[in-house]
């Protein structure tokens, strides 16, 4: 018998996971929506962000510095990836994009394993958010509540960039018609570089925020990548609001199903994805956009 406090705790766990998936998926969806690149290395960006934050924390004992340093590292790595490798695959078949980004993902995982080993690493939560908080009817880890708030602020910042700045206007126009944007004299390749960097940074930032909740391992990006792609499909490719909505839905599905039977969490997640595709082939908030 499942008690109400346990059920509500699982709802909170689903909210925390959903917020994390929303942030990672928002980066992936704007990358694919703008650049048309299926980035299988996105999960590795999540993992590398966590490890970069771990290194920064080891030397500074500052969680804030760890977040800044880890996010900056992954953003720079994303920019370099776009300029050196990804740029040559914009007009190539998706199969080529999958192969090259899958290869990059394997390289990043093995590099992390070489430097950090296979044993898990952890970053403690910052002192103000350590311990547990009483919600009246139950106790809940303070950091998980804080993580939801931090990610919400990050999503709001990304929303403002996409919908309240000239760069965001160009990015959203590029999602609809990249050729039209280029015909207006805009350097789309510079925009692509910035978008890839922002998308990678979103994943890296999520990796650091998640580090005090789940241990860091070189393979941690693989499972999150699968969940992220499902979120993008549910929400709609290229849709930022869709990524947020899809992330929250996926988080609750995984959390609630895991409480009943952990073995069926992914089954239920893919079942919901299939149902969404049957009813709305372009996702809940997606449009036809890029083919």
Regions found by a protein language model. Give the residues of each.
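Alpha-helical transmembrane segments within multi-pass membrane transporters and channels
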Residues: 61-105, 111, 245-250, 280-281
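Membrane-embedded helix boundary and interhelical linker motif in transport proteins
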Residues: 12, 34-80, 84, 89, ...
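Transmembrane helix-bundle core of multi-pass membrane transporters
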Residues: 88-89, 93-164, 191, 256, ...
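Short, non-helical or kinked segments that cap or interrupt transmembrane helices
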Residues: 19, 26-50, 91-97, 167-170, ...
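Inter-helical junctions in multi-pass inner-membrane proteins, predominant
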Residues: 2-20, 161-166, 192-234, 254-264
């Amino acid at each position: 018998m499942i008690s109400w406090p346990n059920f509500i705790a699982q709802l909170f766990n689903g909210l925390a996971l959903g917020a994390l998936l929303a942030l990672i998926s928002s980066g992936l969806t704007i990358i694919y929506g703008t650049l048309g690149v299926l980035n299988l290395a996105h999960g590795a960006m999540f993992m590398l962000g966590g490890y970069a934050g771990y290194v920064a924390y080891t030397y500074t004992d500052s969680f804030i510095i760890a977040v800044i340093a880890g996010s900056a590292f992954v953003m720079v790595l994303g920019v370099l990836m776009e300029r050196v490798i990804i740029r040559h695959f914009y007009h190539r078949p998706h199969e080529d994009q999958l192969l090259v980004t899958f290869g990059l993902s394997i390289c990043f995982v093995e590099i992390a394993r070489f430097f950090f080993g296979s044993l898990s690493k952890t970053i403690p939560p910052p002192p103000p958010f350590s311990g547990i908080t009483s919600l009246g009817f139950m106790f809940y880890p303070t950091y998980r509540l804080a993580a939801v708030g931090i990610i919400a602020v990050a999503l709001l910042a990304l929303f403002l960039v996409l919908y309240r700045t000239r760069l965001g206007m160009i990015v959203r126009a590029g999602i609809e018609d990249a050729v039209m944007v280029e015909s207006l004299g805009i350097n789309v390749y510079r925009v692509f570089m910035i978008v890839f960097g922002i998308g990678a940074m979103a994943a890296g930032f999520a990796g650091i925020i998640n580090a005090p909740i789940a241990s860091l391992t070189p393979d941690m990006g693989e499972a999150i990548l699968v969940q992220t792609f499902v979120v993008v499909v549910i929400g709609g490719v290229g849709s930022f609001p869709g990524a947020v909505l899809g992330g929250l839905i996926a988080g609750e599905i995984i959390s609630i199903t895991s409480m009943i039977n952990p073995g069926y969490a992914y089954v239920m997640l893919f079942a919901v994805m299939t149902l969404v595709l049957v009813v709305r082939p372009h996702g809940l908030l997606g449009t036809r956009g890029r083919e």
